[in-house]
Amino acid sequence: MSDATPTVENTNIEQTNIQSNSHDMKLLKVISLLMDYPSHELFADDTLDVCKDLVKNSRLISPAVRGEIADLIDSLTNLGELEAQARYDSLFERGRTLSLWLFEHVHGESRDRGQAMVDLMAQYEQAGFAIDAKELPDYIPMYLEFLAYQAVATGDEMQVRMDIADVSHILAVLGARLIDKQSEYASLFKALLQVAGQPLSLIDDELANMNKSEAVKLAEDSLEAIDSEWEEEMVDFLGA
């Protein structure tokens, strides 16, 4: 795990800063924990079992997606801590395509990213949601933790769903890329789209775009190969 990757420290789903009896909002906490780096705490006690039970009882996601998240939890259990961490590193720590920092997908390394960070941090502070100074506020598991907190603190679950919908295009891209890698982590992004009331066809659209781009790249590579072969034949002919 790189030093740049924060972890959501509170792995106790039943105890948050503000108590909630809502399975709906606890689902965001579960997704946050499962999307975060699989630290030792995730495998301690009965955390994964509690996650599985909350997913099973969620009213916000479809039975199919519930089953896919259950499969992810089972795979974490079967892999164990070290192998789960190695798998996570191979997915999320190798380049930017699966970056879990929201603003990296929106602003890249431009100055706009810094201002967006400042604005989001101010939103956290105004809500009374404290994070460590070294942590970046746009880390998706952290953002989900904040939204779960907000839903309970304000009682405005609709606003939380709208906030998730605002980044649905990023979630769809990440979901599609994970499906392309045949990763069970894709289920978490499907779940977030459903919580936000967004269609899973957004992921299908991104997959179609990826396939189209890959087809174009293959065609371009083929043309380059043909041109190269033709040039070699011309050189051989002229040199004959």
Which residues are covered by each model-predicted region?
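Charged, alpha-helix-forming regions
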Residues: S2-A240
